[in-house]
Design a protein with these regions (language model features):
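Active-site nucleophile loop of the alpha/beta-hydrolase fold
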Residues: 104, 168-176, 194-196
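Acidic catalytic loop of the alpha/beta-hydrolase fold
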Residues: 197-200, 264-266
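Hydrophobic h-region of N-terminal signal peptides that target proteins for export
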Residues: 9-17
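The conserved beta1-alpha1 loop
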Residues: 72-76, 193-194, 260
């Protein structure tokens, strides 16, 4: 069993305080929520230990009568977890949810050809285990969003774990090397792709060391897996198109939003309004 460092760092850039010192945490049954960076210790395949930061972003004042939903957010390749703080800070400040922002090893998520050789499913499992020590978290309302390589990680977690009720893979789709499994549990998916994306083309194909599925085919595979309606409702949003596969197992839903002039760097501050509205339904 990998050890989780009990030491928490104050997230200085946000000017917040961690009222629990490491010594106090060692003797307590649970930790109080506050904005901080925790450190997760993980062993690589070569038995080298690495220490990986995870930002926990909370409102300034915790309502102790409330159990907060949890949103994991995954950066793209070459990015870092700090990028999500500003994107989602209005939601975390207002207490809509608690933000959990892990850091990819070597600034990437290990889907095969990436620089990272870390077991990132294990890493997320370790984070979830650590979060069980905190008060006021609702593990029945846990969601994940990711962009680009982080989107691929979100898909992988949905395929291989049952942590999340809904996911939002942004600017990527399923890849051939990570097929859906018999053990994959029903989950709601909001997939968003830009038709003008040249980094991960909407039509799929070989790119960045992966073979990407066509974006529509990717959504259709989720829908088929969960026995959704195979005739999606098609909603025109100006020039953009939303495909809704409903009537899925366990009252789940698959949505695919095609943004016609969207490139790889989609406007997250705008998109997340719809993502959060989608998450809240599950």
């Amino acid at each position: 069993m990998k050890n989780i460092l009990l030491k928490s760092l104050i997230f200085l850039s946000l000017g917040s305080c961690d009222e629990n010192s490491p010594n106090n945490n060692l003797n307590s049954n649970s930790y109080s929520l506050s904005t901080k960076t925790i450190l997760i210790e993980q062993s690589l395949d070569n038995n080298n230990l690495i220490i990986r930061p995870v930002i926990i972003q909370t409102p300034n004042v915790i309502d102790t009568s409330k159990s907060y939903p949890i949103v994991f957010a995954f950066h793209g390749r070459g990015g870092n977890n700090n990028s999500w703080v500003n994107h989602l800070i209005n939601y975390t400040n207002s207490g809509e949810f608690i933000g959990i922002y892990p850091q990819g090893y070597l600034e990437s998520w290990n889907l095969g050809p990436e620089p990272s050789n870390a077991n990132d499913v294990e890493f997320i499992n370790l984070i979830v285990d650590e979060l069980q020590n905190y008060d006021n978290l609702n593990f029945d309302k846990m969601y994940a969003i990711g962009t680009s390589n982080g989107s691929g990680m979100v898909n992988k977690l949905a395929i291989e774990t049952n942590h999340f009720k809904a996911i939002a893979p942004i600017a990527s789709q399923l890849i051939e090397s990570l097929p859906l499994l018999d053990s994959t549990n029903p989950i709601s998916v909001l997939q968003v792709n830009g038709a003008a994306d040249t980094t991960i083309p909407i039509d799929g194909g070989p790119m960045l060391g992966h073979v990407f599925l066509d974006a529509y085919e990717s959504a259709e595979l989720w829908a088929t897996k969960f026995n959704c309606s195979q005739n999606p409702n098609i909603i025109m949003l100006g020039q953009d198109t939303l495909y809704v596969f409903d009537s899925c197992e366990n009252e789940k839903e698959i949505r695919y939003l095609r943004i016609e002039d969207g490139e790889h760097n989609l406007p997250l501050h705008i998109l997340f309004q719809d993502v959060w509205a989608f998450f809240q339904r599950f």
